[in-house]
Structure formats: structure tokens, C-alpha cells
A protein has these predicted regions:
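Bacterial Sec-dependent N-terminal signal peptides
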Residues: 15-30
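Extracytoplasmic
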Residues: 27-122, 136-153
């Protein structure tokens, strides 16, 4: 049964990569883009996916640096206020018109929900942002099959994001 679930997930992932590749061949062949091409949108879900509301949260120009080890993302010239984050919204990371990956939520230290997918975590005590694979970011949750599958599905697009930051010298180890 697990094999079928993984196979189905792989097929869905392959189709999403393939559809982006047709639209932006150069982007995925070189795995590089300009930092100015990165855009991150709040996506407020509606009942119809075609009517979702997109509003710009920040761009690549607002990314000061990203630490691959800690997953901290330093934003400059912008402060994301968790109180103003639209309810039931996600964060979609894009390069040009092609979606890279989606953060399932914007969470803070005071959230009590568990998220088994990528989140933008804001540490209100240290005033820092992180792109974590789950929330809370513990080994017990991170090692679950669901979280590991989502990490695997995001790998190709995550590498494009990392390589773009690396080319712009905005990557820290």
C-alpha cells in the first residue's frame, strides 16, 4: 500500500515539475535565476482554487541571506507581522511565473497547532524568521513519513531556490 502512495506522490510531483519545465525551460535546466525573480505571495484560500487571492509578501530583494544549516532567512527592509497574516493563508515561493514550493503557514512561538509541511516560522523572542520543514521543528515530527515525503517532493524546487541564493552570494553555511 505504501508503495502505491509513494508512486502516486511521485507521479503528481513529476507532473508539476514537468508543467513548470515547459513554461520556463531555462530556469530548471540551469537551476539558476536572478534573486529579483523570486517572489513570495500570501495565498488566501477560497472555495475555488482558480479564485484564490494572491498578494505580494516580499521579493528576493528583501532576502538579506539564508542560512542552509539553521534555515534562518534574514529579511531586510520588511517586517512580517504575524497579527496581519491572513487567516487560512499560505506562502507561495515563485521564480518568474513558476511556483517553487508552498509554505503551509506562517507560525510563531505561540502556535499550538502541528504542521507537517514547510512553514515560515517567526521566533518572536529572537526576532528571526526560519523556513522549517514542520512545526514544531522536532526530530519526532520531522522524522515522520508524511514530513519526509513532503521534503522529498520539494527537493528539486528547493535546490533551485538554494542555487539562486548561492549565485547571488546570499547563502550562509
Amino acid at each position: 500500500m505504501k508503495l502505491y502512495v509513494y508512486l502516486l506522490g511521485f507521479i503528481a510531483y513529476a507532473l508539476s515539475v514537468y508543467s513548470c519545465k515547459n513554461e520556463n525551460d531555462e530556469l530548471f535546466e540551469t537551476s539558476l535565476a536572478n534573486i529579483s525573480d523570486i517572489e513570495v505571495y500570501w495565498v488566501r484560500n477560497t472555495h475555488s482554487e482558480s479564485q484564490n487571492i494572491y498578494s505580494l509578501a516580499f521579493t528576493g530583494a528583501n532576502i538579506g541571506w539564508f542560512n542552509v544549516t539553521t534555515r534562518e532567512i534574514k529579511l531586510k527592509n520588511i517586517k512580517l507581522d504575524p497579527n496581519r497574516f491572513p487567516v487560512n493563508s499560505k506562502l507561495e515561493f515563485r521564480i518568474k511565473d513558476c511556483p517553487l514550493f508552498m509554505a503551509s503557514s506562517f507560525v510563531t512561538n505561540i502556535n499550538s497547532q502541528v504542521f507537517l509541511d514547510l512553514v515560515l516560522f517567526y521566533d518572536i523572542i529572537e526576532d528571526k524568521y526560519y523556513l522549517d520543514d514542520c512545526y514544531p521543528n522536532t526530530k519526532a515530527i520531522k522524522n515522520t513519513a508524511d514530513v519526509q515525503q513532503r521534503i522529498s517532493e520539494r527537493t528539486t524546487h528547493w535546490e533551485v531556490f538554494i542555487n539562486t541564493l548561492k549565485a547571488e552570494k546570499k547563502l550562509r553555511q
